[in-house]
Amino acid sequence: MYVVCSDLESIYVPEIWISLAKKTGIAEFNITTREEPDYDKLMKRRIEILKENNIKLKNIQEVLAEESPFLGAKDFLGWLSSVARLIVVSDTFVEFANPWINKLGNPILFCNSLIIEKDGFIKEHVMRQDNGKKKVVDAIRSLNYKVIAYGDSYNDINMLMQADHGILYCPPDTVKEQFPQFPVAYNYNELKDIISKILN
């Protein structure tokens, strides 16, 4: 039996920080794990920028409430849930992701959390585990399941490598070129075809 592990942002929903960059005009928010593989370093800098610009958690949540999942995402997940079990494995934070997970039909989400100050500013981020995506795959495989994993960026690679089948979904050229061993899908139909071939 297969379990599917997938990333969240850039797969089913927009990148949270890119949405914030568009809303605030702060260009540095456009930097994601596609450009900066060190997620801890990236998040510490993001939190600094939020404080420098007087942006609180509620402001971020208001921006995200205006966003919708990508066209076709919910239908794709409906199909996927009929053929396998899905766990969304993301480096994002439950305080950001819950509204989107609701819009996607409430798949299981494994992610991280934030420490919020009394005045509403984000104090720091708390990673549930180091290298959490890989450890999720390890745990599932230890239960004698096979794993299909897909993601788009550097922080997904360990998860893809640890899975029985890894797939890149709409990756930047730099990631695709560095990891040519993974098949690439550029839309949900292509992803569905790759997964269907694995399952059959």
Annotate each language-model stretch with its function:
Residues Y2-S113, E117-K118:
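Alpha-helical substrate-recognition element adjacent to the catalytic core
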Residues G78, D138, I157-N158:
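Alpha-helical segments flanking ligand/cofactor-binding loops in enzyme cores
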Residues L86-D91, Y145-Y186:
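Acidic, Mg2+-coordinating phosphoryl-transfer loop and its flanking beta/alpha structural elements
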Residues V94-N98, D156-I157, K192:
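Short, well-ordered alpha-helical microsegments
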Residues F110, F182-L191:
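Short acidic-hydrophobic, aromatic-tinged amphipathic segments that line or gate anion-handling sites
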Residues I194-N200:
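Short amphipathic alpha-helix with an adjacent loop that forms part of the alpha/beta core around
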